[in-house]
């Protein structure tokens, strides 16, 4: 009888201790390394649970070495009670066999500040529902979806990005995304947009017209390899702080015109390959003359481009980034005007041939007068 009483007391003590033990978030990996499950309870030690971070490049998740085998991620019902997560950075990075995420709606992101690399290199994911994410405190979204190469849909239209400073590589290499709504993004605090949409090669439309870029310093490769984009409105971009525009529009092969008349390039040191291989581009609207330390191949591979002069494959650097003797076309007028010889030159405006040669007077045919193409009869 005494022995049974002692046993019962011990059992009650165990239950009491378990009840007192604090709940905590953790993750477990199945014995075959294919399923990663997230819990929030007091059984971490019993389940052999692993810490859920915060993680970084120097401090990877405990499951990182097995991430290539993970095919399924599950959020247990208990995780809905967890409000202590401050970082989801690197959680599923390089899970290139991951095809299903179950219960993601149970992840409370209200206090999360870092989502960098969260789904980076999830190359097998075809769908992902992040529409419920509360991102009001997030400051870093860099590399968040980079290399999600067969993801066909992604709803980020409700993301609150008011505090985000880094969007570098955010959607880079999302090759199969046919649409992406970022029109509501508040980018007033973003400083880095490099590679943000790089190689989103299936996108045909992208509305960035409301982007506030006043604090952005890096736009390198921002729209690089957006092969299917047929239009892109960057007319309101404030680029006063930008130092790098290298390869910004490279390989945007479907664009036929681009208005960069608002661009302030006073601080830009790199324009190399900026419009390289925009093979359908005929018109770049800009009233200013640009200059830059590095501008090699800036206009290379743009055979249809015509501004003040016709395109010459041997003239592809920033020397020709102007509307008077280069490839820019001034805004606010028709591209070609027809005048009589007597009225062809107004107010002693500079006159050039299509090859860029300074003329003393207009000649019959096409002339460049005041940065406009003028046909003299």
Which positions does each model-derived feature cover?
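C-terminal tail/sorting-segment detector
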Residues: 3-4, 366-377
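Residue-level detector of functionally pivotal "anchor" positions at catalytic/ligand-binding pockets or at interdomain
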Residues: 331-355
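Extracellular Ig-like/FN3 beta-sandwich strand-entry sites
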Residues: 362-364
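Short beta-strand elements of solenoid repeat domains
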Residues: 93-94, 117-121, 143-147, 168-173, ...
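Short strand-coil-strand connectors
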Residues: 32, 355, 369-372
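Structural signature of tandem-repeat unit edges
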Residues: 69-83, 97-113, 123-139, 149-165, ...
């Amino acid at each position: 009888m005494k022995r049974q009483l002692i046993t019962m007391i011990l059992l009650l003590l165990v239950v009491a201790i378990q009840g007192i033990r604090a709940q905590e978030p953790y993750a477990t990996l199945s014995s075959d390394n294919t399923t990663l499950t997230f819990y929030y309870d007091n059984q971490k030690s019993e389940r052999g649970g692993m810490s859920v971070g915060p993680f970084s490049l120097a401090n990877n998740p405990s499951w990182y070495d097995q991430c290539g085998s993970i095919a399924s991620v599950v959020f247990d019902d208990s995780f809905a009670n967890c409000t202590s997560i401050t970082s989801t950075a690197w959680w599923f990075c390089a899970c290139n066999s991951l095809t299903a995420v179950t219960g993601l709606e149970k992840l409370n992101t209200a206090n999360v500040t870092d989502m960098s690399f969260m789904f980076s290199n999830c190359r097998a994911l075809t769908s992902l529902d992040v529409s419920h994410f509360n991102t009001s405190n997030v400051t870093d979204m860099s590399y968040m979806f980079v290399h999600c190469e067969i993801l066909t849909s992604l709803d980020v239209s409700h993301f609150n990005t008011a505090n985000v400073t880094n969007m570098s590589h955010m959607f880079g290499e999302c090759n199969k995304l046919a649409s992406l709504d970022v029109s509501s993004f508040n980018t007033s605090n973003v400083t880095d947009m490099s590679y943000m949409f790089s190689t989103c090669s299936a996108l045909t439309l992208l509305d960035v017209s409301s982007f506030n870029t006043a604090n952005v310093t890096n736009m390198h490769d921002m729209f690089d390899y957006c092969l299917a984009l047929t239009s892109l409105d960057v007319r309101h971009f404030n680029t006063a702080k930008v130092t790098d525009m290298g390869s910004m529009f490279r390989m945007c092969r479907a664009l036929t015109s681009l208005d960069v008349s608002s661009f302030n390039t006073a601080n830009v040191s790199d324009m190399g390959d900026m419009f390289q291989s925009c093979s359908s581009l005929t018109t770049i609207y800009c009233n200013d003359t640009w200059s830059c330390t590095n501008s090699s191949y800036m206009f290379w591979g743009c055979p249809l481009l015509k501004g003040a002069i016709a395109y010459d494959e041997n003239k592809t650097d920033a020397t020709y980034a102007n509307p008077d003797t280069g490839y820019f076309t001034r805004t606010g007028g028709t591209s070609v005007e027809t005048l009589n010889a007597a009225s062809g030159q107004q107010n002693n405006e500079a006159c050039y041939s299509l090859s860029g040669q300074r003329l003393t007077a207009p000649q019959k045919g096409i002339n460049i007068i005041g940065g406009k193409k003028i046909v003299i009869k």
